[in-house]
């Protein structure tokens, strides 16, 4: 799947998480939950899906960021 196809299939909640992650690299799950007004379990589920699809990556200190490939659209 390319970036356009992935974004077309995202829920509103996932698009919200992705949007916040674009503006705040290296963000925690709790910070995402607060910024998006989405429950922590829902954010965890969305992030796990993003990790499986290689849209996001987990840093050493439990912070998450979008992968450079996804950000650049060269997925």
Regions found by a protein language model. Name each.
Residues 38-49:
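Short amphipathic alpha-helical interaction segments
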Residues 3-14, 28, 55-75:
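Short, cationic-aromatic polyanion-contact patches
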Residues 7-35, 45:
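Short amphipathic alpha-helical interface segments
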Residues 24, 49-53:
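Alpha-helix C-caps/helix-loop-beta hinges
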């Amino acid at each position: 799947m390319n970036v356009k196809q992935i974004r077309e299939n995202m829920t509103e909640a996932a698009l919200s998480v992705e949007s916040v992650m674009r503006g705040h690299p290296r963000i925690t799950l709790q910070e995402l939950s607060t910024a998006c007004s989405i429950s922590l379990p829902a954010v965890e589920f969305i992030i796990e899906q993003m990790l499986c699809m290689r849209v996001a990556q987990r840093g050493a200190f439990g912070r998450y960021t979008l992968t450079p490939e996804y950000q650049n659209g060269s997925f």
